[in-house]
Amino acid sequence: MNKKRLLPNDRKQQILDAAIKVAGRPGGWSKLTRDAVAKEAGCAEGLPSKYFGTMISFRRAIMRAAVVAEELGVIAQGLAAGDKSAQKADPDLKARALNTLAG
């Protein structure tokens, strides 16, 4: 299989998109790992660390991206876990996210 080499900003976005997908699964935020994201993104396992550093920095970047994209399931899980970036989201967005937990 011939993998296409992406520009750094494109690769970083690909990793964030994959992370949001992984985090959006039931229980995904609490079980989120760099390896799971790398597998979803189809990239080397070390690339999430290369682009985002620590897991704390990675989670912050993921949640900020989820807030911008209004990924309600990810935001709801972040709120339930006490994530600071999720807590800083717009009140209306937080309310809509929490409604996804209610069913």
Residue ranges with predicted function:
Residues 1-10:
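N-terminal intrinsically disordered/low-complexity leader segments
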Residues 7, 54, 62, 66:
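Short acidic-hydrophobic sequence patches enriched in Asp/Glu that either
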Residues 9-13, 56, 95:
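Generic alpha-helical secondary structure signal
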Residues 14, 22-61:
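Helix-turn-helix
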Residues 63-71, 75-78:
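Short, basic, alpha-helical segments at the C-terminal edge of helix-turn-helix-like DNA-binding modules
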Residues 74-103:
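Hydrophobic alpha-helical connector segments
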